[in-house]
Curated annotation (Swiss-Prot):
Function: May mediate protein transfer from the SecYEG translocon to the periplasmic chaperone network via its periplasmic C-terminal region.
Family: Belongs to the YfgM family.
Assembly behavior: Interacts with the SecYEG translocon. Forms a complex with PpiD.
Lineage: Bacteria, Pseudomonadati, Pseudomonadota, Gammaproteobacteria, Pasteurellales
GO cellular component: plasma membrane
Membrane side Cytoplasmic: residue ranges: 1-23
Key words, A-Z: Cell inner membrane, Cell membrane, Chaperone, Membrane, Transmembrane, Transmembrane helix
Entry protein name: Ancillary SecYEG translocon subunit
Periplasmic face of the membrane: 45-204
Transmembrane segments: 24-44
Main subcellular location of this protein, as a coarse class: membrane
Membrane topology summary: Single-pass type II membrane protein
Organism name: Aggregatibacter actinomycetemcomitans (Actinobacillus actinomycetemcomitans)
Length: 204
């Protein structure tokens, strides 16, 4: 099992957007809630803090990608130090991706459950839930996989969500429900994806 090109592109886009916009987010927060008092100090402190977290994330990921086993403790420490932040969630998604590549699906499942628990962002939560369902499907955990798909709230993932639901339902022997899920997936899919889904429908 591997993540789709669309999933990887979406996660890359999320990372790029965050790196480009986190300063603006901080400014908006201060204007809305901070008032004028302490503006310069608070702005400087938060930007330095975010720069530090970003650099630490990139370094931790670089080291972990080179040798996951040797760097596991340090990578987990980074996640702990940045608990409940987007960087922790992104690190957990990266950890799961590498685990899947190494066919360590239980480790991937654990990382994705942590990502869901730590995420306060609908997009990251949806990505985490979709990937968790994929891993659980790979592990033969069909009912938990369907349950995880309920946490995919972002509409951009509706096609992928329904497609995976159809695959899981088909594995459970429920062809009628699988057919409905595939048809729903087709409604939001691109041209190529529609053709691939039609193949599934034709084989029911």
């Amino acid at each position: 099992m591997a993540y789709t090109i669309e999933e990887e592109q979406e996660l890359t886009a999320i990372k790029a957007w965050w790196n480009e916009n986190y300063k603006f987010i901080i400014v908006c927060f201060v204007i809305a809630f901070g008032g004028v008092f302490g503006w310069n100090y608070w702005q400087s402190h938060q930007i330095q803090k975010m720069h530090k977290a970003s650099a630490e994330y990139e370094q931790a990921l670089f080291n972990y990608q080179k040798d996951p086993k040797a760097q596991a403790e340090q990578f987990n420490q980074f996640i702990k130090n940045n608990e409940k932040t987007s960087y922790a969630v992104l690190a957990l998604l990266d950890k799961a991706k590498i685990a899947v590549e190494n066919k360590d699906f239980p480790l991937a499942e654990d990382a994705l459950k942590q990502a869901m628990a730590q995420s306060n962002d609908d997009i990251l939560s949806s990505v985490s839930a979709l990937r968790l369902a994929s891993v659980q499907f790979q592990l033969g955990q069909l009912d938990p996989a369907l349950e995880s798909l309920k946490s995919v709230k972002e509409q951009a993932w509706n096609s992928a969500k329904n497609l995976l639901a159809g695959d899981i339902q088909l594995a459970k022997g429920d062809k009628e429900t699988a057919k409905k899920s595939y048809q729903q997936a087709q409604e939001n899919a691109g041209a190529l994806e529609q053709q691939l889904i039609q193949v599934r429908l034709n084989n029911l």
